[in-house]
């Protein structure tokens, strides 16, 4: 059955109402990754881990890696969102993640890592949390 003018107007109105919600969701996702990058750059592993779901698979490994990484190194992190798909409860995000790692030792080397990191997000109590990161090895301290 063809849509009538009132149906089209109603659909357009509903779409207009929903548009800011999706725009807000995208901004919230960007804010989350800005927070994660800042936490690493400031050497604050606990602030990074606060935005991660503690029940995610391999959380303990990620926690060990992040805490060791920030304790042993000075970091500069930059994250670009390449792909962001999903709804207001879950998102699948691909990130171009750059991590510069300089050892705190006097003769410390500079290591640059750049990788596509796949991330799944879940909204928990009105906040986005990281539900999975792949590869977790990206966050391992240099050997």
Regions flagged by a language model, labelled:
Residues 13, 68-72, 109-112:
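Short, solvent-exposed secondary-structure boundary motifs
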Residues 4-6, 69-73, 130:
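Short, surface-exposed loop and linker segments with low hydrophobicity and enrichment for Pro/Ser/Thr
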Residues 1-9, 15-21:
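N-terminal secretory signal peptides
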Residues 30-34, 45-96:
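Short solvent-exposed beta->alpha transition segments
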Residues 88-143:
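Exposed beta-sheet edge and beta->alpha loop/turn motif
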């Amino acid at each position: 059955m063809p849509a009538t003018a009132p149906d089209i107007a109603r659909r357009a109105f509903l779409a207009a109402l929903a548009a800011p919600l999706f725009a807000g969701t995208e901004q919230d996702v960007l804010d989350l990754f800005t927070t994660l990058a800042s936490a690493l750059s400031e050497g604050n592993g606990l602030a990074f881990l606060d935005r991660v779901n503690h029940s995610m698979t391999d959380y303990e490994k990620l926690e060990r890696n992040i805490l060791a990484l920030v304790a042993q190194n000075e970091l500069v992190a930059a994250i670009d969102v390449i792909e962001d798909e999903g709804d207001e409860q879950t998102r699948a995000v691909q990130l171009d993640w750059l991590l510069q790692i300089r050892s705190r030792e006097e003769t410390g080397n500079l290591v640059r890592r750049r990788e596509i990191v796949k991330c799944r997000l879940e909204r928990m109590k009105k906040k986005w949390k990281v539900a999975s990161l792949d590869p977790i090895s990206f966050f391992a301290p240099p050997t």
